[in-house]
Amino acid sequence: MTGVGRRSFLRGALAGTGAAAVAGLPASADSATPAAVPFHGVHQAGVTTAQQKQAIFASFDVIAVGKHELTDLFRTLTDRARLLTAGGAPAPLGITAPPADSGVLGPDMPGDDLTVTVGVGASLFDERYGLEDRKPAKLTPMKEFPDDSLDESLCHGDLSLQLCASETDTVLHALRDVARHTRGAMQLRWRVDGFRSLPRPAGTPRNLMGFKDGIVQPAPADHDKLVWVGTGNGEPAWTEGGSYQVLRQIRMLVEFWDRVSVGEQENMFGRRRDSGAPLDGSTETDRPDYAADPTGTAIPLTSHIRRANPRTAETAASQFLRRGYNYDKGTDAVGDLDMGLLFCAYQQDIARQFEAVQTRLANEPLVDYIRPVGGGYFSVLPGVRDGDDHFGRSLLG
């Protein structure tokens, strides 16, 4: 590769990326394979989509120069997401060109329930792209809470990418493909690979503390008032159909947790470890009766479920949609296990929902066994409506 060609690849890749991305598309990108999640829609897939087993959460710093290159970046992300989620065989780029695909998934890429969900951070709305007056009304950098131990290198970012699918190689393939086609326009800031455990023995899957996680979720009928952003929420018109994403990398101090009695663990969560039932119930779907237990005899007043969701009329509006994944990073520098939960939540208003809940959880007993170390707040873009649309089109005007 010549010096000019190499520099074009590393720094100015976007000049021809849009055409290359389209050239790599199968003959019919919209003809989804049987295991494909539809890409086009009012909302992005990957928010209310049935949760897949594997995930990668990645945050990027955007290094594209000017609004034109930023637009090219969003067009490229759209082309790649449309291709990857549909599956099929990529068209060859030519006999002297590099292969159109890494080949990790074989000659015919399966759809594999892959979803690609794109969000933007508050830092994108600075003077670089002239978007200062386009920032979503409720988007801020992630707040640091009293019990956090945040590592700046694991926080924030201009752009978030959530990749979810049935198999690990599918999400890894998707990340590799996106990184290849956006090189020179954005660079990885931090990344967490997640997995969702099988229900054991049934019902909601468990986190790495052994407790069922994500039992209570907003009803689909409530998504318009709890999950999706609309023009009636004081937001810019371009955000309609989007959402707010909160990501939190929560390390679990499992060596210490495993020394705690089951009874004490259950009192901290407010649920039975075996069944997931609230401590005053018998099944995981039972609704705790706080009115009948005002002093916390059955479910301690300091328990996680009681503080997170007091189930009052005043706190009903703070519910959010959870879509978290377990993670395992091996060991840290001193040999301790580095594992935990990549907490992911979607909502209409971060302050009203996630931050209100997190404030209620301050100093709960569980904080001795968990350590939030990273994450970020992102505005999830509206969906790509059709083949002529692209991510960020309404934002960029």
Regions found by a protein language model. Give the residues of each.
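Long, histidine/aromatic-enriched segments associated with O2/redox biology
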Residues: G3, S8-L25, D30-G397
